Amino acid sequence: MSKKTFEELFTELQHKAANGDPATSRTAELVDKGVHAIGKKVVEEAAEVWMAAEYEGKDAAAEEISQLLYHVQVMMVARGISLDDVYAHL
């Protein structure tokens, strides 16, 4: 599996949101559905991170965290929030 940086993933998601077909791109589909649908996925994935961290191993928790980060970045793309916008608050 190829590794991506947070920045590389964000750039890829921006491209998919702008150019992807919602019928074939999960990212484009989520952005098309809007902030409410994306928000539901963020909450779902956050709960899965918690459960994996508490009851499963390191690998399961890491996988769930990666899915949470994906959905958070999709939310950022949908709302027009840049990485620099977020970095300003770190």
Swiss-Prot record:
Top-rank lineage group of the source organism: Bacteria
A GO molecular function annotation here is: ATP binding
Q: Which GO terms describe its biological process?
A: L-histidine biosynthetic process
Intracellular or extracellular location(s):
Cytoplasm
Q: What keywords were assigned to this record?
A: Amino-acid biosynthesis, ATP-binding, Cytoplasm, Histidine biosynthesis, Hydrolase, Nucleotide-binding
CC annotations in GO: cytoplasm
The catalytic activity of this protein is classed by the Enzyme Commission as 3.6.1.31
Task: Show the InterPro entries listed in the entry.
Answer: HisE, PRib-ATP_PPHydrolase-like
Matches recorded under Gene3D superfamilies: MazG-like
| Similarity remark | Belongs to the PRA-PH family.
Know the name of this protein?
Phosphoribosyl-ATP pyrophosphatase
Q: Which species is the source of this protein? A: Streptomyces coelicolor (strain ATCC BAA-471 / A3(2) / M145)
